[in-house]
Amino acid sequence: MTDPIADPVVPDTLAEPRLVVEPGVAARFAAVAEPVLQAMGYRLVRIKVSGEAGCTVQIMAERPDGTMLIDDCEAVSRALSPVLDVTDPIDRAYRLEISSPGIDRPLVRSSDFARYSGHLVKIEMAVPHQGRKRYRGLLDGVEGDAIRIQREGVTKDEDPLVLLPMHDIGDARLVLTDELVAESMRRGKQAERELKQSLGLAPPPPPHAKRSDPKKSSAPKPKPLTKPVVKPDAKPKPKNTKQHRLAADRLRRGDTDLSEGD
């Protein structure tokens, strides 16, 4: 069977730079893997090198719509393995793993934050922002070079909305929720259906069918977390009914010192 190739996309989408890049050995693997992935229509998400004796190199990749099927992983492995054998980025034996980013995936590009707006995220800043390094809350989209977060667990004196500069983010990933699992399943089924159609294993979609927009999330738009507003009563209640009655009696008697006798 022909290896799956991701759908043709605008080159700028594949070449969009990552906000967080790996240092050291992982960076050498990234330099080799990224051009191969882009040529196949995939994007590099993250590379992790773990273990000393039994070294494992995990390469996370995805289609531009955020999906990655088993067939995709196998195709990438077959294309990338011989290239890595020639370039030899590491001086010891290792085991290569090609995987999808997973449901609670890392967010590594500006488009990731836009796509998963409305989902719960946790952020660790490389540079502290407003005296904090860790944030958790609803992702509320992108604003220029920053992301908007509706923070969880804020006090009544704190503003829940915070803007975090993207270039200061050290790590960002989705938090596993029921809504995220449901959307991930929807995306996976859509990608599998489109793959079968492209390989001729399933009938093509009807002409009027609309393709899902990979840049958009089906998650509900986050509602702004506003501070509680205390509304005044329609009719002010007397603070001391007895005091008011005594004051009224003194007024009727012509007394000028209304505090006398309280």
Curated annotation (Swiss-Prot):
Keywords, alphabetical: Cytoplasm, Ribosome biogenesis
GO terms under biological process: ribosomal small subunit assembly; translation
Subcellular location: Cytoplasm
Main localization of the protein described in the UniProt heading: cytoplasm
Pfam families xref list: DUF150_C, RimP_N
Annotated Basic and acidic residues bias: 185-196, 246-256
Region of interest called Disordered, as start-end residue ranges on this chain: 185-262
Gene Ontology CC terms, in alphabetical order: cytosol
Cytoplasm found in the keyword field: yes
Cross-referenced HAMAP family: RimP
Function in brief: Required for maturation of 30S ribosomal subunits.
Family: Belongs to the RimP family.
Protein name: Ribosome maturation factor RimP
Gene: rimP
